[in-house]
């Protein structure tokens, strides 16, 4: 793949915490329009890499570019404005706000008024707020949680909270959706529904970059996969090829990939 094909380009990234090397010389490219999976044993550096990509951490070496623009070192809100949205392994909803309000908060990233303007609520802002609500309801419908629009986020089932978090991320109209273990805690029925939703998001034009411990889900969903182990990339390619890679099998001790 040429550099011109990459929407997200992680270039020789390193991240250290004291004497611990969490990421070492990691390079990968995510193409526009694909679902790209990042897997590896616990402690491999997957979430650290997500944190570097989304601006929570600055890399100690290397760089991250998105759409041809260097974004490493930018704050998370600036990276969100570039078109990267993220969900977290531990769901981070506003528990005492409704599902609709949660998505509206996400939508404010893409408005002229922003969150502060929504509080001040001038005439123009009120009209914009009505448009934001309509759009937020569309994202709730898209993600299958429209019926819970007026319910507090904390009252939703775990699966619906995951869907709500995705709806809020989509409300920013990202070019890249970064999902940190989106299937965590889901039962088989919820995982199947999630897979359908993620495929639909990809088919509608977004690019997905996900961490997931459910290797079976990753192998069936992703177009390409990278594998981290002890902070280093040990494999990258199509799921079928990665699954047969001796280094990957050794890292997982044959268990999850058997």
Indicate where each model-derived feature is located:
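Glycine-rich phosphate-binding loops of nucleotide-dependent enzymes
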Residues: 2-258
């Amino acid at each position: 793949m040429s550099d011109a094909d990459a929407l997200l380009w992680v270039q020789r990234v390193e991240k250290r915490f004291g004497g611990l090397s969490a990421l070492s010389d990691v390079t990968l490219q995510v193409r526009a329009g694909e679902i790209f999976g990042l897997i590896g044993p616990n402690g491999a550096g997957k979430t650290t890499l997500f944190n570097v990509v989304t601006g929570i951490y600055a890399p100690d070496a290397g760089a991250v570019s998105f759409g041809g623009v260097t974004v490493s070192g930018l704050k998370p809100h600036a990276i969100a404005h570039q078109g990267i949205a993220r969900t977290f392994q531990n769901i981070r909803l506003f528990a005492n706000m409704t599902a609709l309000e949660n998505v509206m908060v996400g939508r404010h990233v893409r408005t002229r008024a922003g969150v502060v303007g929504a509080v001040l609520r001038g005439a123009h802002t009120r009209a914009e707020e009505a448009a934001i609500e309509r759009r937020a309801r569309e994202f709730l419908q898209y993600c299958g949680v429209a019926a819970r629009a007026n319910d507090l986020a904390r009252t939703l089932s775990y699966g619906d909270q995951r869907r709500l978090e995705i709806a809020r991320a989509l409300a920013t109209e990202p070019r890249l959706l970064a999902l940190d273990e989106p299937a965590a805690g889901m039962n088989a029925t919820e995982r199947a529904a999630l897979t359908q939703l993620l495929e639909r998001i990809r088919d509608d034009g977004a690019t997905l970059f996900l961490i997931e411990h459910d290797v079976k889900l990753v192998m069936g969903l992703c177009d390409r996969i990278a594998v981290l182990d002890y902070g280093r990339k040990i494999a990258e390619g199509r799921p079928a090829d990665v699954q047969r890679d001796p280094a990957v099998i050794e890292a997982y001790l044959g268990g999850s990939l058997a």
